[in-house]
Amino acid sequence: MKVGMIGLGRMGEGMSRRLIAAGHEVHGYRNNYKKAEEQFEKAYISGCTTSVEGLVQVVHSSKGTLTQDDAKSPGVFMMVVPAETVEDTLNELLQFCVEGDIIIDHGNSNFKDSRRRAERLSKMGIQYIDCGTSGGVYGLERGYCLMVGGANTAVSTCRPIFDALAPGIAAAPRTCDRDGYTLYPEEFGWIHAGSAGAGHFVKMVHNGIEYGIMQAYAEGFNILHEANAGSKYVKEGDAEVAPMDCPEDYCYDINVAKVAECWRRGSVVGSWLLDLTADVLRRDGELSNFAGGVSDSGEGRWTVHAAVDLGVPAPVISSALWSRFESRRLGAFAAKVLNGMRAMFGGHDVR
């Protein structure tokens, strides 16, 4: 398929490279055209343009000026841009798209915004797909887990794209009783979750769960990190803090990095996030290069809001969100563990 890619940063470049490796033709546009040219020279994209209008033209036709009449076929356009720029990017793209085109939003948009956008575009004859995308900077090698929302026809048209981006069936053992049965998209690492907004809704909850898991790791490693507090204990301490009953019980000088490495093998708490945590702790056991305050990008808040709207208890996710708020005041080691993980899986600037 011929695809137009808007946004060629960490995620966009990796996605483009996977698509090209699978035989697709990817033409890109980014604000930094010089960088886009460099990506073209490295064959990370099939071509680059200096404008959104030019991108639409090249996706639809290899010659001539695009009009409603001379468009050869509907175009597929992927937006991999920050949530706060989706609306402006979409508005610019809509100036040049034609009826039948498909626009895929791979960002972390609020699912309510995705529903609104899909309804708006449907009145123009343009199909909108919201695609929650997980995988971060490792997606190029591991593949991207995709949570898709939109009309059946649009999703079916774009299935070759999703198949190319997803990790594939070999990424995990098949669950019980599936051997020999028909293979489904979710076994390849992508799912058509439902109508417009469903993809971003599922991705929102995914990120809420991520908050909770990361917080549990951070708190556990913080306890290990402080396990030698008894050796530093001063009996005449703060009158507002309950005294430690048996300081001698907490005189363990535990190497947190080595514990993380051990837990990666055979432990029930093993995971990819633990792998990343072990990696960052091995490099800097005290995480001295990481800030103590942890950002929240929005999805955790949206998940808590949805839980309140639905009347569904979510104490772990809520607590993890509150902890991120508090971390920006305290700068504790637990917050540095969280930032270490975020830097590893998402390439976030947390120093």
Ranges and model annotations:
Residues A22, M124, L310:
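Conserved dinucleotide-binding and phosphotransfer motif residues
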Residues M1-K63, T67-V76, F96, G100, ...:
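NAD(P)+-binding Rossmann beta1-loop-alpha1 motif at the extreme N-terminus of oxidoreductases
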Residues V80-V81, H106, A164:
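Short, well-ordered coil/turn residues at beta-beta hairpins
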Residues G143, M147, T157, A164, ...:
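Helical "substrate-binding/catalytic lid" subdomain
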Residues I102, H106-V155:
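Rossmann-fold NAD(P)-binding glycine/threonine-rich loop
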Residues M79-L93, N110-D113:
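Beta-loop-alpha module in the N-terminal Rossmann-like domain of NAD(P)-dependent dehydrogenases
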Residues V26, G47-C48, I103, Y128-I129, ...:
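Hydrophobic beta-strand scaffold residues
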